[in-house]
């Protein structure tokens, strides 16, 4: 199943756990916030990263 990945940069606190858990999907931007590097993914790590985000800034929707 493919997932559409988004990060609410207003909510993101720059913890970087998502980029550590799933570097193929998330990267840290120059603004210190997480940003998806792909629009959709089927990687399980994206869900793991969303669950690990301490502020719930990551949203996954069925693509």
Swiss-Prot record:
The yes or no answer to whether the keyword Transport is present is yes
Keyword list (alphabetical) reads:
3Fe-4S, 4Fe-4S, Disulfide bond, Electron transport, Iron, Iron-sulfur, Metal-binding, Repeat, Transport
Name its co-factor(s). [4Fe-4S] cluster; [3Fe-4S] cluster
Q: Which InterPro entries match?
A: 3Fe4S_ferredoxin (IPR001080), 4Fe4S_Fe-S-bd (IPR017896), Fe-S_cluster_ET (IPR051269)
- Where in the chain are disulfide-linked cysteines found? 22-45
Superkingdom: Archaea
Cofactor: binding comment:
Binds 1 [4Fe-4S] cluster which readily converts to a stable [3Fe-4S] form.
Q: What does the protein in this record do?
A: Ferredoxins are iron-sulfur proteins that transfer electrons in a wide variety of metabolic reactions.
Gene Ontology molecular function: any one: 4 iron, 4 sulfur cluster binding
Per UniProt, residues of the 4Fe-4S ferredoxin-type domain are 3-31
Please identify the protein, giving its name as recorded: Ferredoxin
- The yes or no answer to whether the keyword Nuclease is present is no
- Residues recorded as binding [4Fe-4S] cluster, renumbered to this chain, are 12, 15, 18, 53
